[in-house]
Regions:
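Short intrinsically disordered terminal tails
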Residues: 1-5, 56, 75-81
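N-terminal acidic leader/helix
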Residues: 2-32
């Protein structure tokens, strides 16, 4: 079961990192954010991650799609609040 707390926690963390990522001009900072989010995705509610990812195993872990994925995740979580 996905709890309201897990949604709020994920939203807060991902939203904050997404805002920084989108406006950052520093490659090392973007890389650090990608690593932090991938680690968070590994540890977050699997049910919540599955709902956001539509079954994609590399969701929030693919460097080439990261900005698209984190933006989508924030939108999904916002709608779940």
């Amino acid at each position: 079961m996905i709890t309201k707390d897990s949604i709020e926690t994920a939203y807060s963390f991902l939203h904050q990192k997404q805002r920084i990522y989108v406006h950052s001009t520093l490659d090392w900072q973007k890389d650090d954010i990608e690593i932090a989010i991938a680690t968070y995705a590994d540890e977050m509610s699997q049910e919540l991650l599955d709902d956001m990812s539509s079954g994609r195993a590399d969701f929030l872990r693919d460097h080439k799609r990261f900005q698209e994925d984190i933006t989508e995740a924030v939108e999904i979580l916002e709608n779940m609040l």
